[in-house]
Amino acid sequence: MKSEYDVIVVGAGPGGSLAAKTAAEQGLDVLLIEKRQEIGDPVRCAEGVGKAGLQEFVEPDPKWISADIKCARIFSPDGTMVELSEKMAGNEVGFVLERKIFDRELAKMAAKAGAEVQVKTQATGLIIENGQVCGITGKRHGDEFTARAKVVVAADGVESKVGRWAGINTTLKMKDIETCAQFLMTDINIKPNSCDFYLGSKYAPGGYVWVFPKGDREANVGLGMLASHYKGKHPIEYLREFVADKFPEGKILETVVGAVPVSGMLPKLSTGGLVLVGDAGHVSDPITGGGIINAMSSGRIAGNIIANCIRAGDVSAKALSRYDAEVREALGKSLDKNYKIKEVVTKVSDNTMNVAAHSLQGVDFENVTVTKLVKEIVTRNPALLKELVGLI
């Protein structure tokens, strides 16, 4: 490992690897570091992505695809099912990935593009001179090191420290943190080409349960719920209750827990010598918590902007603010809209969910928007107007 680079990327998730790959393809000297000894492990998400979104960045490869999804089924609290086509189901429905392989493949692409990749290497601080970030301090296999860089990319996830070290406020309100728990399960009866979602306060107050197929009788079974909706139980306790009810004969192969920002994008994504990508910049979807595609989008934008700024010899806060503008242009409208929807949906009662699900029986969902769906529900049930008006 050298003592100086053009770019140092902290975190080898999808956003970090895309930033490293893109910058390296532009001829920059890039270091990509990952604090864990294995990239992609442990898995900390449901692993669902939309096909169109994924294909913007990489050609799908069967070796890292666990399931090809054709539809989504949403179950209201009373068990009423609404089925959506893959097209209508959203950005997290299309493929279920094998993240342990997928993340490593992205890092491998970065390496093939010319980036240096180091695992078991952790950033412990930033080098800041005259208010400008110009490198990191860290530990590699227990040994301390210092490495300078023209730009540092913070891709260290929702628990990101790098942005805070640079003076960017990354604090999340309780209502904007989704705590997640997930079991990888086998010996369960599932629909192999459907991603299933369960709503309601019994299993996931302020959130939802997901069942994402991973193969024959195998699935990621997890839930995410807002920290502000805890009722004296940890999410994993709710998850155990769901599994006991729905999959009593199933076997748990793996357990993971984590957190996802559902706040919408940070107001500030960069400063002199530093940018934030992926969950570090809170670009995950406020409704679903899904963030793989948005992370890759922000990473690619970061790599291109950084290359332009370095070529121009200007990596100041003003120059790098172009990154903020481009990410906001690409993702901001969708994230802002979905945050508003989240704020309404998390206040909707179980009864309203049930009535809405009943109202949607027999509806043709082809080319239907959220607004049209809500109008259909309200037309059939005028009493729900007050509760759902924020979605129209």
Swiss-Prot record:
Disulfide bonds: none
Binding residues annotated for FAD, in chain numbering: G15, E34, C45, A46, G48, R99, A123, D279, G291, I292
Pfam families xrefs: FAD_binding_2, GGR_cat
Cofactor: binding comment: Binds 1 FAD per subunit.
EC number(s) given by UniProt: 1.3.7.11
Chain residues that bind a 2,3-bis-O-(geranylgeranyl)-sn-glycerol 1-phospholipid: V370
Cofactor(s) for this UniProt protein: FAD
InterPro entries: DGGGPL_reductase, FAD-dep_OxRdtase_2_FAD-bd, FAD/NAD-bd_sf, Geranylgeranyl_Rdtase_fam, Geranylgeranyl_reductase, GGR_cat
Enzyme class (EC, first level): oxidoreductase
Functional pathway: Membrane lipid metabolism; glycerophospholipid metabolism
Keyword Lipid biosynthesis carried by entry: yes
A molecular function (GO) term: oxidoreductase activity, acting on the CH-CH group of donors, NAD or NADP as acceptor
Source organism, top-level taxon: Archaea
UniProt keyword annotations, A-Z: FAD, Flavoprotein, Lipid biosynthesis, Lipid metabolism, Oxidoreductase, Phospholipid biosynthesis, Phospholipid metabolism
Recorded family membership: Belongs to the geranylgeranyl reductase family. DGGGPL reductase subfamily.
NCBIfam families assigned: GG-red-SF
Summary of the function given for this chain in its UniProt record: Is involved in the reduction of 2,3-digeranylgeranylglycerophospholipids (unsaturated archaeols) into 2,3-diphytanylglycerophospholipids (saturated archaeols) in the biosynthesis of archaeal membrane lipids. Catalyzes the formation of archaetidic acid (2,3-di-O-phytanyl-sn-glyceryl phosphate) from 2,3-di-O-geranylgeranylglyceryl phosphate (DGGGP) via the hydrogenation of each double bond of the isoprenoid chains.
Note: Reduction reaction proceeds via syn addition of hydrogen for double bonds.
Protein name, entry field: Digeranylgeranylglycerophospholipid reductase
Organism of origin: Methanocella arvoryzae (strain DSM 22066 / NBRC 105507 / MRE50)
